[in-house]
Curated annotation (Swiss-Prot):
The lineage of its organism: Viruses, Riboviria, Pararnavirae, Artverviricota, Revtraviricetes. Residues 25-27 are annotated as: HBEAG. Residues 1-19 form the signal peptide. This is External core antigen. Residues 165-214 are annotated as: Disordered. Its main location: secreted. It comes from Hepatitis B virus genotype A2 (isolate Japan/11D11HCCW/1998).
Length: 214
């Protein structure tokens, strides 16, 4: 199995630092968390059960349908696009290596061990990575982080004291917007009086003009 790890690192041609984190951190037990720079952690993702994440094929189809142009672009779009590219490339290399091992390893038991290891361990990690970055691009990073925290609280709460259904990611943005709107404004400010509009100073009008250009 150590030989398999070494071959995997050598064959993984992802060119950036994030890819090195993915391969080296997970395979050699280094304390490197590929989610830290995005405000999450491996532990936070681990609250989600393994069957929560779609298959790699479904996630790749989703990434291609939604973000193919950006992923194929030579431009730097966002850190999430970059991490998504690297996760896809690492999965391609994993599949290539697994196919090669399956075709060249004579011992059936060893061959099954390699295939199962890739599908079970690395497959889950790739599914988590793909889901996280696709979700951040689709719903926004803050929404995804809020969802992970909400799910973690829900799953750790005894069944007798929690709602019957887990939080749903697609319903969080609407809730978040309403919450921020309620916190940020009062009804009085929403409808200023006519006298207030007439008494605006030139300085205030200039600042509003600048804001409207953003």
């Amino acid at each position: 199995m150590q030989l398999f790890h070494l071959c995997l690192i050598i064959s993984c041609t992802c060119p950036t630092v994030q890819a090195s984190k993915l391969c080296l951190g997970w395979l050699w037990g280094m304390d490197i968390d590929p989610y830290k720079e995005f405000g999450a952690t491996v532990e936070l993702l681990s609250f989600l059960p393994s069957d929560f994440f779609p298959s790699v094929r479904d996630l790749l189809d989703t990434a291609s349908a939604l973000y193919r142009e950006a992923l194929e672009s030579p431009e730097h779009c966002s850190p999430h696009h970059t991490a998504l590219r690297q996760a896809i490339l690492c999965w391609v290399e994993l599949m290539t290596l697994a196919t090669w091992v399956g075709n060249n390893l004579q011992d059936p038991a060893s061959r099954d061990l390699v295939v199962n290891y890739v599908n079970t361990n690395m497959g889950l990690k790739i599914r988590q990575l793909l889901w996280f970055h696709i979700s951040c691009l689709t719903f926004g990073r803050e929404t995804v982080l809020e969802y992970l925290v909400s799910f973690g609280v829900w799953i750790r709460t005894p069944p007798a004291y929690r709602p019957p259904n887990a939080p749903i990611l697609s319903t969080l943005p609407e809730t978040t917007v309403v919450r921020r709107r309620d916190r940020g404004r009062s009804p009085r400010r929403r409808t200023p009086s006519p006298r207030r509009r007439r008494s605006q100073s030139p300085r205030r009008r200039r600042s509003q003009s600048r804001e409207s250009q953003c």
